[in-house]
Regions:
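N-terminal leader segment of winged-helix/HTH proteins
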Residues: 1-35, 82-84
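Pre-recognition alpha-helix immediately N-terminal to the DNA-recognition helix
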Residues: 16, 43-47, 107
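Amphipathic, non-transmembrane alpha-helical scaffold segments
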Residues: 18-21, 25, 65, 109, ...
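N-terminal helix-turn-helix DNA-binding core of bacterial DNA-binding proteins
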Residues: 26-68
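Short, hydrophobic-biased segments on the C-terminal half of alpha helices
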Residues: 58, 76-77
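Charged, amphipathic alpha-helical coiled-coil/dimerization segments
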Residues: 77-135
Length: 136
């Protein structure tokens, strides 16, 4: 059985979806820079804060941001030098260092996250329509 061929509308849908994602990414990068963070630093802070039950470690950040361990280590060191994170021995495994946000980072991340949620609310109708169209 052969796969169905792509139609012009399929290409347009994918192009529109990617353009919408790029719009959000550009917004996110601009917001991060407006508070003195690089986009990657913002992503790392969000990854650490959003780790939930998982212990945020350098390896965890590397995996979530799709970075090589040495790149993640450098990123974490720069965040620590900037006073945005601390490293603490993990209560469950003293060999691991758990990453924690400082109060300064918590404030920055909360402001950024609120702005991102508002932007997503704005983009939601477009994203929902695009995703719904994939099924059609």
């Amino acid at each position: 059985m052969s796969q169905p061929k792509m139609k012009d509308a399929d290409y347009a849908l994918l192009a529109n979806f990617r353009a919408t994602l790029r719009t959000f990414i550009a917004f996110s990068e601009s917001q991060a820079r407006s508070v003195g963070l690089t986009p990657q630093q913002h992503q790392a802070l969000l990854t650490i804060r959003g780790s939930g039950a998982a212990t945020a470690t350098v390896g965890y950040v590397a995996g979530r941001l799709i970075l090589k361990p040495h790149s993640a280590s450098g990123l974490i060191s720069r965040l620590e030098e900037a006073g945005l994170i601390t490293r603490e021995a993990d209560a469950a495994d003293q060999r691991r260092m758990a990453l924690k946000l400082t109060p300064q980072a918590e404030g920055l991340l909360e402001a950024l996250s609120l702005a991102h949620i508002e932007e997503l609310k704005t983009l939601k109708p477009l994203l929902v329509n695009l995703v719904d169209d994939f099924g059609g």
